[in-house]
Amino acid sequence: MIGSVKRPVVSCVLPEFDFTESTGLGKKSSSVKLPVNFGAFGSGGGEVKLGFLAPIKATEGSKTSSFQVNGKVDNFRHLQPSDCNSNSDSSLNNCNGFPGKKILQTTTVGNSTNILWHKCAVEKSERQEPLQQRGCVIWITGLSGSGKSTLACALSRGLHAKGKLTYILDGDNVRHGLNSDLSFKAEDRAENIRRIGEVAKLFADAGVICIASLISPYRKPPDACRSLLPEGDFIEVFMDVPLKVCEARDPKGLYKLARAGKIKGFTGIDDPYEPPLKSEIVLHQKLGMCDSPCDLADIVISYLEENGYLKA
């Protein structure tokens, strides 16, 4: 950041912009006059700050314009104005803003309009190479008290010992921040899982082995998360532990509160748990017959090794 600027320093120079050498490229920051109707960077008076690197002017006939964010130059694909359909939500509505010029193709996803997917030049396979592993999501599901978080930590420790990079998205931990606005109503639980699924997908795309540990009481939301990832990269681990075993453990005292009516909608008591139907790994535990967390983690690690996830 430069001076009192409170947002990323961004510069954009297209052929239609009035760019001159008088911008003072040798200085730490300068400005470029933009068209009055240019609103990509807010409602400022047609002026945008520059910094770190000199702006790059697109040459006549070029198919890209150059953008700088904190000194990083990125190129965006353009369309000819003839490609623009002003009646379509998948393109810019105002095609006449720069007559005869090329425009970026945008789209609508959910409630987000006029957005553009920027494909990075560094592919997932390249990000995985220095890590010597394949990014994936290990989704641990089961009743409260079934040992999900314990397994997640043991698995993370076991993989760390092998020099592998992991990150745990724990159901409770995520509700301390990202999902602190969500309750435990059915619709909020579904949104909780959706958000965690999207974050887990980003970790996997970065080459990280992401371990998501949460109850996931209904089948549909985790299945939707599975569809976000390439085939095989969503590995569901079902902690198949009977309710009576989980209730006997009751590490947080939640079953006792639920039985006393002090917690409503508690999974396994007055709200259903739908066991997954197509888990890659099912870990069975019974009363008096429970493997250690390290033994369970070894089962998951063996699966990862056999399926090539612990090498690039």
From Swiss-Prot:
The EC number(s) this enzyme carries: 2.7.1.25
Domain of life: Eukaryota
Amino-acid positions noted as binding ATP in the UniProt annotation, renumbered to this chain: 142-149
GO cellular component, one term: chloroplast
Alphabetical keyword list: Amino-acid biosynthesis, ATP-binding, Chloroplast, Cysteine biosynthesis, Kinase, Nucleotide-binding, Phosphoprotein, Plastid, Transferase, Transit peptide
Catalytic activity: adenosine 5'-phosphosulfate + ATP = 3'-phosphoadenylyl sulfate + ADP + H(+)
Pfam families reported in the protein's UniProt record: APS_kinase
Sample GO molecular function, one term: adenylylsulfate kinase activity
Protein name per UniProt: Adenylyl-sulfate kinase, chloroplastic
Source lineage: Eukaryota, Viridiplantae, Streptophyta, Embryophyta, Tracheophyta
